[in-house]
Amino acid sequence: MRILSVTAQKPHSTGSGVFLTETVRAFARLGHENAVVAGVAPDDSTVFPEGTRFYPVQFGTPELPFPVAGMSDEMPYESTRYRDMTPEMAEQFEHAFALVLRRAV
């Protein structure tokens, strides 16, 4: 089976990111083909099981000129709370993810 996992957060940070990474590992052990779309900062590194296709959405760039989105008031990395996004930021966010998702599928 081909599985695409998507998160706007960093894949190796926070509970949901670690959960995503471990889920991808479990799917890989079962022989499934994995791909991941995730938000990352310019200096982030990622490690997934061999054969996993990774499609990063780069924050802190001209296209997304703010830190990775986060779901909590306090994250273990510099982040942008969804509730603090302006309409322009939300549009940039949606556009960036749409472009990467089209490549992934």
Regions found by a protein language model. Name each.
Residues M1-Q58:
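N-terminal subdomain of nucleotide-sugar transferases
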Residues T23, F27, V100-V105:
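Hydrophobic, Leu/Ile/Phe/Ala-enriched alpha-helical segments that form helix-helix packing faces
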Residues A35-A104:
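A conserved catalytic-core segment of Leloir-type glycosyltransferases
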